């Protein structure tokens, strides 16, 4: 009987129920997967090797997840959102705009930036992906047509890299 052996450069290899899982060690450096067999006589025969390009994940996009007619919806900014939808939202999430990849991101924090009646810019921070009570109170008091910004959104993906995401312009309807 032959034993199949698999090895990888620039990565970690794990056997799964469906086959093999490869997790690259370093982005931007090729990963090479090699397969060989070991025969009954103990001789190892190389079957082949295949290089793969390992790219950095693109930056995700921040959004406010809310409920619309009982279904989850995503607000990415620059258009009006109802005050009710805004107040019912729990916080900020992040995802890749490219639907081909299902990558999970954790929002580590963000700032809600608004202008008071005197035109002064005020920032209120959250140290998670959730709106704070103070941020929710500010949104509750916003009148129709007012704008505020969600900025300095920090998100971390499965690669462990923390990224600062572009701001969201929120228009209260």
Residue ranges and their predicted role:
Residues 45-61, 160-173:
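Short beta-strand elements
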Residues 107, 120-173:
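Mature extracytoplasmic or organellar-lumen-exposed domains after removal of signal/transit peptides
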Residues 19-27, 137-142:
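Extracellular/luminal low-complexity segments enriched in Ser/Thr/Pro
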Residues 9-23, 49-51, 122-133, 168:
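Solvent-exposed serine/threonine-rich low-complexity stretches and specific carbohydrate-binding patches
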Residues 5-7, 28-41, 48-51, 145-157:
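Short, aromatic- and glycine-rich surface loops/edge beta-strands on solvent-exposed regions
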Residues 51-80:
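Low-complexity, Pro/Ser/Thr- and charge-rich linker/hinge segments at domain boundaries
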Residues 91-101:
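Short amphipathic, basic-aromatic surface patches that mediate peripheral association
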